[in-house]
Amino acid sequence: MAEISESSIPRRTGNHHGNVWDDDLIHSLNSPYGAPAYYELLQKLIQEIKHLLLTEMEMDDGDHDLIKRLQIVDTLECLGIDRHFEHEIQTAALDYVYRWWNEKGIGEGSRDSFSKDLNATALGFRALRLHRYNVSSGVLKNFKDENGKFFCNFTGEEGRGDKQVRSMLSLLRASEISFPGEKVMEEAKAFTREYLNQVLAGHGDVTDVDQSLLREVKYALEFPWHCSVPRWEARSFLEIYGHNHSWLKSNINQKMLKLAKLDFNILQCKHHKEIQFITRWWRDSGISQLNFYRKRHVEYYSWVVMCIFEPEFSESRIAFAKTAILCTVLDDLYDTHATLHEIKIMTEGVRRWDLSLTDDLPDYIKIAFQFFFNTVNELIVEIVKRQGRDMTTIVKDCWKRYIESYLQEAEWIATGHIPTFNEYIKNGMASSGMCILNLNPLLLLDKLLPDNILEQIHSPSKILDLLELTGRIADDLKDFEDEKERGEMASSLQCYMKENPESTVENALNHIKGILNRSLEEFNWEFMKQDSVPMCCKKFTFNIGRGLQFIYKYRDGLYISDKEVKDQIFKILVHQVPMEE
């Protein structure tokens, strides 16, 4: 089929680059790790490690025992294999550590005592909070001196080098899972980031730090908690631990690393099949022949697989990728390829859910809307089958909210109107697309979601508001210059500066970054608080939010697929992890 171009009517342009992925490359992906023998080896390793975990954790009570348990939990999580050991992690590690926990942190010798080991306390606090145990950040105040600096409580040469850096790294990672109003966490984060940056620069008060530990420090500084997605973290730590020869002297560490590599490769084989399916679906849909829409199906699938990689969530990943593609087609159409008159007709078509309203529009719009209606209706059929009840209204209403927000933006652009900051944010949260990107996959998870659960995770709900808000701000912070060039004058930055004409761009950026940071703390709370929402649902929403921060860290990774983005995708989707014989 020949590619279809736009009509001669003058229209704005998005200046999007084309598809950077060769379909032949995607369809050539082939891994031997789908063979049953590898799955059998995986199960054998899991059982061996479970036995070793019980052996490793059957030690005399004391600080070393507590740290050992916490280090094992941290390693399993960093390598992305903790799901195989959920029972052991809770009963043999976290429940045990919590029995020693008090208002000052981990007990030493008895529960009522106080351990002066910052590394143990920070590791324990982070692990317990992430697993929703009730722990207070106030324990970290015990490690501040009279000058407000955090200390490790080592003496002499013992305090130089690895132990001190390890303690500060643990404190940094603990400080990142803060809740609103926890001042000590803000202080700890600022202090440790400055300290560890000095270490990386070769300055400060420590010398001769282990290179593998420095790699961990570099990763933590480059990819904080909200910018670190599970698959990228696992892939990175496979390399970090793989080069740590002293760490590999332990038998259990060797087996954990081997399991993590095998697990990654087996899962990657499944992910190959999914991205190949999405690529065929995209090619066969006909929409791929419209040469002015962004072709980002590989990037969208990579986004979701970096966040939600487990084998049981295949349908949700595919639904997410399809939904993201629909959002992009609509985004490009409303932003740059349709007139305001056409946009109003398209919006009315979605309001009434009547495709015939677009009959008199250009062919490229009709093709796009046929693709949109067909895909949404197909997803609704899958959702109804999974949930066992009619979900048509909730899905369509979510799409209508999304489309209405685009119409509002188009009207602002057409009239040159710059809304108030609050008006922009409210509409921008809807136009982020996170509502529908979150809803479709959630409804295809292996969970029945009754109305009382949906009310807590769908619009209007606090966790969805925060997903939309943090996504919108992260997008704006990276895109405002590009969008200004395309004529999209309304962004959170410009709206804020219009209301505050005395503000500089730097001040406006700092204000908006402050909103983002506070919102991420609230996001932490909504994710980790105890409620009736299935954890897989909250985890999906939270990790998609982390994925957005990852994507927008250095660039708009969905708008610009540069070499670094391609390299990341190759490491996750294309290249296998080398296995030692």
From Swiss-Prot:
Describe what upregulates or represses it: Constitutive expression.
How many and how are cofactors bound here? Binds 3 Mg(2+) ions per subunit.
Sites binding Mg(2+) 1 sit at: D331, D335
Cite the binding residues for Mg(2+) 2.
D331, D335
**Cofactor(s) needed for function:** Mg(2+); K(+)
Instruction: Enumerate the Pfam families for this protein.
Output: Terpene_synth, Terpene_synth_C
Identify the residue span(s) of motif DDXXD motif. 331-335
Recorded hits in SUPFAM superfamilies, A to Z, give: Terpenoid cyclases/Protein prenyltransferases, Terpenoid synthases
Instruction: Provide the GO biological process annotations.
Output: diterpenoid biosynthetic process
UniProt main location, coarse: cytoplasm
Naming one, the record's GO cellular component terms include: cytoplasm
Q: Where's it found, cell-wise? A: Cytoplasm
Q: Tell me what reaction this enzyme catalyses.
A: (2E,6E)-farnesyl diphosphate = (1E,4E)-germacrene B + diphosphate; (2E,6E)-farnesyl diphosphate = (+)-delta-selinene + diphosphate; (2E,6E)-farnesyl diphosphate = (+)-guaia-6,9-diene + diphosphate
Could you tell me which InterPro entries the record lists for this protein? Isoprenoid_synthase_dom_sf, Terpene_cyclase-like_1_C, Terpene_cyclase_plant_C1, Terpene_synth_N, Terpene_synth_N_sf, Terpene_synthase-like, Terpene_synthase_metal-bd, Terpenoid_cyclase/PrenylTrfase
Which top-level group of life is the source organism from?
Eukaryota
Pathway annotation from the record: Terpene metabolism; oleoresin biosynthesis
Q: Where does Mg(2+) 3 bind?
A: D475, E483
What EC identifiers does the entry list?
4.2.3.71, 4.2.3.76
Q: Name one GO molecular function term.
A: magnesium ion binding
Q: Does the keyword Transcription regulation apply?
A: no
Keyword annotations for this protein?
Answer: Cytoplasm, Lyase, Magnesium, Metal-binding
Recorded family membership: Belongs to the terpene synthase family. Tpsd subfamily.
The Swiss-Prot or TrEMBL note on domains reads: The Asp-Asp-Xaa-Xaa-Asp/Glu (DDXXD/E) motif is important for the catalytic activity, presumably through binding to Mg(2+).
Give the note: In sesquiterpene synthases utilizing farnesyl diphosphate as substrate, magnesium is more efficient as cofactor than is manganese.
Stated role: Involved in defensive oleoresin formation in conifers in response to insect attack or other injury. Involved in 34 sesquiterpene (C15) olefins biosynthesis.
Q: What name has this protein been given in UniProt?
A: Delta-selinene synthase
